[in-house]
C-alpha cells in the first residue's frame, strides 16, 4: 500500500500521463492518497513560508511577525482543494466537455491531489537564497495538473486543458497588472 502511494507520487513528479489513464489509481484508496498528498504539501509549504517571513521581518525590522497556525493552513488547503476541484469540474465537465468526457467530481478531486505531488519538492527550500526556487515546483504542479485534466477529461489537445487550468492564474495576473497601472496613473496629493 505504501509502495503504491510512493509510486503515485513519483509518477506524478515524472509527469507520467499513464498515471491518470489507469483506473486502478482511482480506486477506493485513491481519495485517501490524494488527501494525504494535499495535507503533506500544505505542511511542507510552511517551510518556505516561514523562511519568507523571517526574511521580511529582518528587512522591515519587526521581530513579531508570526505565520499562520498549522490548523489554519490545513483547513485553508482543504477548502482551496475543494474549490479548485469544483471550478475544474464546472468548467471542464459542464461548460467545455469533449465528446468523450465522462468524469465525476471525485475523479477530478483525486487528480488535483495527485497533481500536487511536485509541491513536495518545496521541502528543499530551507534557506532564503533558495526561496526563488519555490516557483519551480508550482510550475511543475500546474504542468502535472494540465496533464491530469487532459487525460481524465479526454481532451484531444493540451490547449483546452491548459486554458482551463491556467485561466484563474491569468485572470489574477491581469487584475494585478491593471491595479498596478491604475495606481501609477493617479495623482497623490
Predicted ranges, named:
Residues 47-56, 120-131, 181:
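Transmembrane helix-loop junctions in multi-pass membrane proteins
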Residues 57-61, 129-135, 184-189:
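Short alpha-helical linear motifs
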Residues 173-189:
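Juxtamembrane boundary at the C-terminal end of a transmembrane helix
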Residues 1-103:
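Selected alpha-helical membrane-embedding segments in polytopic membrane proteins
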Residues 51-55, 96, 147-154, 182-186:
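Juxtamembrane transmembrane-helix termini
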Residues 89-177:
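Hydrophobic alpha-helical transmembrane segments and adjacent short intramembrane/lumenal linkers
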Amino acid at each position: 500500500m505504501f509502495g503504491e502511494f510512493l509510486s503515485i507520487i513519483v509518477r506524478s513528479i515524472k509527469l507520467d500521463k499513464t498515471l491518470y489513464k489507469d483506473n486502478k489509481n482511482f480506486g477506493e484508496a485513491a481519495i485517501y492518497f490524494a488527501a494525504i498528498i494535499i495535507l503533506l504539501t500544505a505542511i511542507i509549504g510552511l517551510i518556505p513560508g516561514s523562511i519568507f517571513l523571517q526574511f521580511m521581518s529582518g528587512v522591515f525590522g519587526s521581530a513579531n511577525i508570526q505565520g499562520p497556525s498549522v490548523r489554519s493552513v490545513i483547513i485553508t488547503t482543504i477548502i482551496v482543494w475543494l474549490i479548485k476541484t469544483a471550478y475544474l469540474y464546472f468548467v471542464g465537465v459542464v461548460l467545455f466537455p469533449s465528446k468523450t468526457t465522462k468524469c465525476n467530481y471525485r475523479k477530478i478531486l483525486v487528480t488535483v491531489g495527485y497533481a500536487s505531488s511536485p509541491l513536495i519538492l518545496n521541502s528543499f527550500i530551507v534557506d532564503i537564497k533558495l526561496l526563488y526556487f519555490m516557483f519551480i515546483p508550482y510550475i511543475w504542479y500546474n504542468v502535472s495538473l494540465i496533464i491530469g485534466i487532459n487525460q481524465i477529461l479526454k481532451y484531444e489537445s493540451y490547449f483546452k486543458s491548459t486554458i482551463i487550468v491556467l485561466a484563474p492564474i491569468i485572470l489574477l495576473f491581469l487584475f494585478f497588472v491593471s491595479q498596478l497601472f491604475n495606481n501609477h496613473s493617479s495623482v497623490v496629493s
